[in-house]
Amino acid sequence: MKPNYRNIVQKGDEIYLCVNGEWFFYNQTEPPLGAGAMGTVYLGRSCQTQERVAIKRVVDKYANVPSIRERAKLEASLLFRHRNLVEMIGYCELNPYNGPIFIVSRLVQGITLDEHVNTHLRNRKDAVKRICESLYPVMDALDYLHQKGIVHMDIKPANIMIEHGSNIRLMDLGIAYT
């Protein structure tokens, strides 16, 4: 994608992003879906289809570090399809050297493994067995990534999502590298 100043547009409280020719938006006054050391994730929508997506704004102090910026772009450009990974749509930046960078991905809904353990498995006799069983899909996703030469940099229970249909997805590659 060739950056230009029309890739990111602010209209009131809404931020509009052009990613691979498609426009997405989120309202920056809405509470975020989550936040971590590298960024904050907001609920967004496609302007064309109204499909709900996740939009991660990389924290400015990291977005302005060239090596981290390149890794964020790499993570967003990993257009893989695997049932146990979150599908990336792409990224958007104001300019290639500094300033905001956004990563857009398909929205995954459910609860994290952290939440699942604390809510449903605490004090159960079979808790360890159930946790281990939930890790098989994660290992399958990691094997897929490793076969492509990609290393996930932030594996933890908070980055493992159990969808409502019980599919398990590994999220937030932690600014992966190859």
Residue ranges and their predicted role:
Residues 113-125:
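AlphaC helix of the protein kinase catalytic domain
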Residues 30-36, 41:
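Protein kinase glycine-rich loop
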Residues 56-60:
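Conserved beta3-strand ATP-binding lysine motif
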Residues 98-112:
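Conserved short submotifs of the Hanks-type protein kinase catalytic core
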Residues 146-162:
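Catalytic-loop of the protein kinase fold
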Residues 87-101:
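Short beta-strand micro-motifs within the conserved protein kinase catalytic domain, predominantly
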Residues 134-135:
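Activation segment signature within eukaryotic-like protein kinase domains
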